[in-house]
Curated annotation (Swiss-Prot):
PANTHER family: GLYCEROL-3-PHOSPHATE ACYLTRANSFERASE-RELATED, INNER MEMBRANE PROTEIN YGIH
Keyword Membrane attributed: yes
Originating organism: Nitrosomonas europaea (strain ATCC 19718 / CIP 103999 / KCTC 2705 / NBRC 14298)
Protein name (database record): Glycerol-3-phosphate acyltransferase
Gene Ontology cellular component terms for the protein in this record: plasma membrane
Function description: Catalyzes the transfer of an acyl group from acyl-phosphate (acyl-PO(4)) to glycerol-3-phosphate (G3P) to form lysophosphatidic acid (LPA). This enzyme utilizes acyl-phosphate as fatty acyl donor, but not acyl-CoA or acyl-ACP.
Catalytic activity: an acyl phosphate + sn-glycerol 3-phosphate = a 1-acyl-sn-glycero-3-phosphate + phosphate
Keyword Kinase: no
Assembly mode: Probably interacts with PlsX.
Location of the protein in the cell: Cell inner membrane
EC number per UniProt: 2.3.1.275
A GO term, aspect molecular function: acyl-phosphate glycerol-3-phosphate acyltransferase activity
Enzyme class name: transferase
Amino acid sequence: MITVVLIFSAYLLGSISFAVVASWLFKLPDPRSYGSRNPGATNVLRTGKKAAAAVTLLGDAGKGWVAVAAAKYGGEVWELGDEVIAGAALAVFLGHLFPIFLAFKGGKGVATSAGILLGLNPWLGVLTISTWMVVALVSRISSLSALLSALLAPLYAYFLLEKGILIMAVSIISVLLILKHRLNIANLMAGKEARIGKSS
């Protein structure tokens, strides 16, 4: 029962869209109505409101970290297996991608996945985020940074995580993130992908 509660709570937490929350707080248009129409930090940044984008980024990453941290704590208290941690990680990510509060139409999960990785292993999170930052600095393309980071995250996880089920969870999250970027991949191949801070 505790396992079900932890995983379902993680999904509900993931369903909270901080892009929508931040846009409401800063009196901005709904992020689903402009730019890439993606409720994420990069799209919110297109409004020019860096503070709103920061709130979105920290909120989306924070919920990923909290879900994993709660599962770890619950696992210790109730002596649950690593399956609960993996389940919570996947649930919070799926909540962000398919939020019940937004008719199951959510974001692409970049910030949330970063929070999840930090929760699983700080070095895993730091390595993946560093990969994103380096690619972003060179290319100024958020989606390319996310895609390369997603490709490398399972490799980092293989060396940093001891449990196979956690490595599997990271791999599934990476695959889902890449699938969510299908349109971005097409735009990248066509040379039409927007750069960070620019209109889509």
